[in-house]
């Protein structure tokens, strides 16, 4: 069996290869990047639907925030939304209540695009008033305005390695118990002109 690590696994699994796509470290890199730009007050946009407290993207975010000594209140994590409209309303409400929020970290790029839309409707300038960062480097990240800073996972390499590992397991060949990849930060306009590099 081949498992992709998107949540914490606390047990030893037989005949299983774990694939670390870089989700955890990529999330930490998001926070480090925003912190270098002076951001200290974050909102975290979790995926739609039922939240998972063992999600390693969230764990990476929380671990890095803690390591940097940044205070992150539980109410600044928006999760459990059933649809985009609900998420949009919660984000707007939180931004209205707390004018010191200067960054939004989204679980994936579509949610980051929602944050850009909310900021625009509220008259906030991105990145001057609010930095926004996504995850996945989806096609939408290049077509929103401003262009979205995001994190790219090596999807083709991950898929190829997972398939090779699965075939090795089927053939009972020797195979590593864990395969790790590094995610890449793609810096665009949504997180500050001073660190902007074209991708």
Residue ranges and their predicted role:
Residues 1-26, 110, 136-148:
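Flexible loop/hinge segments that line or gate small-molecule binding clefts
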Residues 1-3, 72, 126:
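Hydrophobic beta-strand scaffold residues
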Residues 2, 16-18, 44, 75-77, ...:
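Conserved beta-strand scaffold positions in the cores of enzyme catalytic domains, especially
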Residues 4-6, 20, 46, 79, ...:
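Short beta-strand/turn micro-motifs composed of small residues
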Residues 75-85:
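Short beta->alpha junction loops
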């Amino acid at each position: 069996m081949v498992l992709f690590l998107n949540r914490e696994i606390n047990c030893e699994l037989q005949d299983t290869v774990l694939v670390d796509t870089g989700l955890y470290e990529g999330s930490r890199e998001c926070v480090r990047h925003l912190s270098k730009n002076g951001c200290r007050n974050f909102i975290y946009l979790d995926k739609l639907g039922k939240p998972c407290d063992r999600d390693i993207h969230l764990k990476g975010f929380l671990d890095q925030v803690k390591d940097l000594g940044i205070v992150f209140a539980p109410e600044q994590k928006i999760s459990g939304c059933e649809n985009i409209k609900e998420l949009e309303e919660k984000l707007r409400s939180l931004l209205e209540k707390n004018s010191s929020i200067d960054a939004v970290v989204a679980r994936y790029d579509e949610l980051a695009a929602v944050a850009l839309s909310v900021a625009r409707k509220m008259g906030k300038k991105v990145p001057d008033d609010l930095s926004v960062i996504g995850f996945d480097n989806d096609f939408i990240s290049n077509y929103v305005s401003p262009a979205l800073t995001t994190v790219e996972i090596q999807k083709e390499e991950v898929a190829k390695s997972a398939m090779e590992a699965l075939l090795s397991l089927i053939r009972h060949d020797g195979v590593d118990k864990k395969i790790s990849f590094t995610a890449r930060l793609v810096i665009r306009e949504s997180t500050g002109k001073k660190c902007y590099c074209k991708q």
